[in-house]
Amino acid sequence: MQETRLISKSLLRKSFSSVASPIKPKWLKIKLPSSKTLETKKIVNRQNLTTVCEEALCPNLNDCWSNKHATFMILGDVCTRSCSFCNIQTGKPKSVDKFEPLKVAKAVKDLELKHVVITSVDRDDLPDGGALHFYKTIKMIKKFSPNISIEILTPDFKNKENYLEIISSCAINVFNHNLETVKNLYDIIRPGANYLHSLSLLKSIKNTNKNILTKSGIMVGLGEQLIEIKELFNDLRSSNVDFLTIGQYLRPSLNHYPVIEYYDQDYFDFLKKIAIEMGFKAVTSSPFARSSYKSAEEHEIVKSKMNH
C-alpha cells in the first residue's frame, strides 16, 4: 500500500489551484450515455427538476440513469455552504418552490421507481434548514407511489429549529447523512460543518425512530490516515449507523481540493472488510461508490438480514 502524500493545510488554504493532483489512473473511466440514460433525463427535465447526479458530476450517472435510478435534489441548486470538495454552486438561494414536491412525485411515478433518494443543498437561510420541505416532498411521493421505499440524504440542519421532530416523522426507510471525511480534515473539507454534530444527528434520528435505517458515506484520497478512517468507522457504529458507502474523491476542478491519493479496488475491499467486521449491516466500497449508488440494493440486503 502506498504511503499517503501529505500537504499542509496552510498551503491548501492559500490556493487549491496551486496544488497538483496525481495523474488519474486509466481504470477510472466513466461509461458513455445510453438511450435509457437519455430517457431518464427527458423525464427529469420535463418537470424542470434538479438531480445531484448532474450537479455533483457523479461518475455513476450513466449507470444509474440507464436503470432509471436518480437522486433528486430539492430546495434549489444553490448551496449556502462552500465545501472544498463539492461542485454544487454556492451563494444566495432562490425562494423555495412550493410546487416542487408535486413535480418530484410526478417524476418518480413516471420513472416507475420502486426506490428513490431525495437530497438537498444546505439551506442555512431557512429557519428549519428545509426539513418541512423534505416532509412535504416525501408525503407527496407516497401519495403518488404508496409502495415505494424512500431514502433521504440530508444536510446537517446545524442550529435549526424542530428539524429532528419533522425528519423523524417522515415516511422514510433510510436516513442518510454523510460524514464525508475524517475529523482532522473537517475544517478545510467541510467548513461550516461539525464532525460531532453530524454524528449526533445520525444517532438522534435512530433514537427518535428506531424503524428508520441510518446511513453515512465517506471519500478517501483526501490525505486521511488509516487510523483516522478506523476511528470514523467506530464513531459511526457507536452512533448505530447501519449502512456505509466508501468512494474515491475525484476533484471537480482546479479550484477544488486536490486529490492526494488514488486507490485501487484492493484498498476499497480492505476497508470494506474492516467495516463489516465492525458491524455495519451493508457496505458499498469502490472507487466510484457514492452515497446513493446502489441504495436500492443495499436496502434490500439489510431488509433480508433483518427478516432472518
PLM ranges: what are they?
Residues 1-71, 75, 102-106, 136-148, ...:
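Auxiliary Fe-S-binding modules of radical SAM enzymes
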Residues 58, 79, 83-86:
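Short cysteine clusters
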Residues 63-66, 84, 88-91:
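Short functional micro-motifs and their immediate structural scaffolds
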Residues 78-80, 92, 158, 224:
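Residues that cap or initiate secondary-structure elements
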Residues 82, 126, 185, 254, ...:
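Glycine/Thr-rich phosphate-binding loops of Rossmann-like dinucleotide-binding domains
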Residues 84, 187, 227:
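Alpha-helical elements of the RecA-like P-loop NTPase motor core of helicases
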Residues 87-103, 110-161, 167-201, 215, ...:
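Core AdoMet radical
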